[in-house]
């Protein structure tokens, strides 16, 4: 298949980057070959603007990307949001009640260009250090933003089911948001109807590329809609079973050159 009508949208963590948060040379070379052949390569990530920017710069991203797990479409080359959706105002109450119920919880509120952390733990500290993010440590009441794009919860993986059960047992929580587990230690609150698949569709509309051959690549539960809704859905070998079940194709893991394998597969179609 020629690349000129193909759009690849890939997850970052666990898919594009290795476990050490690096992009393999073989993947970079494949991306460059794909783009030189007319293909469009972009990102769909749970990361916010500041956390996704280093990866966007590393790959020389020249088209918009989906960030905040589908809550926004961002143009890194123009440094501006093209579209975004915010959480229901009830999210503020949810955050306060979670902190009260679980004093050892970490909560991260992601807004357009700021990251607020009203409650922190060791998992969140490690996450912020790894991503070189400077958060604003403050109470929920001190966050004066018009729109929260998403709320991330960090909790030990062996106990995160307690958070999930707490949320799912409260109809008022479930009815006001889309909840998804994005890593074994992360649980996220997103706007209703928002996911990476809906974000991909929004990006295609913005770009005027609704007829493109779409390829979605991912590894975790927050990638399921991206994988399922693409014309070619791809999961890496290290993916969660639910992501694999949604896929048309399984490639090698994120430490072995998954993206280069995807591009080689497309070439042979």
For the regions a protein language model found, what residue spans apply to each?
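Active-site phosphate-binding/coordination module
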Residues: 20-124
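Active-site metal-binding loops of divalent metal-dependent hydrolases
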Residues: 12, 47, 218-220
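Mg2+-dependent phosphoryl-transfer enzymes with acidic/Ser/Thr/Gly-rich catalytic loops
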Residues: 2-7, 24, 188-269
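Hydrophobic packing residues within well-ordered alpha-helices of enzyme cores
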Residues: 27, 52-56, 163, 167, ...
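Short, structured coil segments at secondary-structure junctions
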Residues: 59-61, 69, 77, 175, ...
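Conserved acidic, metal-coordinating active-site core of Asp-based
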Residues: 104-217, 221, 226
């Amino acid at each position: 298949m020629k690349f000129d009508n193909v759009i690849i949208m890939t997850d970052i963590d666990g898919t594009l980057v290795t476990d050490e948060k690096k992009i393999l040379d073989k993947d970079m070379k494949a991306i460059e070959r794909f783009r030189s052949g007319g293909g469009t390569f972009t990102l769909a990530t749970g990361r916010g603007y500041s956390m996704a920017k280093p990866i966007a710069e590393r790959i020389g991203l020249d088209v918009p990307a989906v960030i905040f797990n589908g809550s926004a479409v961002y143009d890194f080359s123009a440094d501006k949001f093209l579209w975004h959706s915010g959480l229901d105002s009830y999210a503020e109450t949810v955050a306060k009640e979670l902190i009260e119920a679980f004093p050892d919880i970490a909560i991260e509120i992601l807004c357009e260009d700021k990251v607020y952390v009203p409650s922190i733990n060791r998992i969140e500290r490690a996450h912020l250090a790894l991503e070189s993010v400077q958060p604003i440590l403050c109470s929920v009441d001190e966050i004066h933003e018009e729109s929260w794009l998403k709320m991330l919860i960090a909790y030990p993986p062996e106990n995160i089911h307690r958070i999930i059960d707490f949320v799912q047992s409260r109809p008022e929580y479930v009815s006001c948001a889309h909840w998804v587990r994005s890593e074994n230690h992360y649980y996220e609150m997103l706007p209703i109807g928002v996911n990476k698949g809906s974000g991909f569709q929004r990006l295609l509309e913005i770009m005027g590329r609704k007829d493109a051959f779409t390829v979605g690549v991912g590894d975790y539960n927050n990638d399921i809609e991206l994988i399922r809704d693409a014309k070619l859905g791809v999961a890496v070998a290290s993916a969660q079973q639910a992501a694999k079940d949604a896929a048309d194709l399984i490639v090698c893991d994120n430490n072995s050159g998954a993206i280069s394998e995807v591009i080689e597969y497309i070439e042979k179609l």
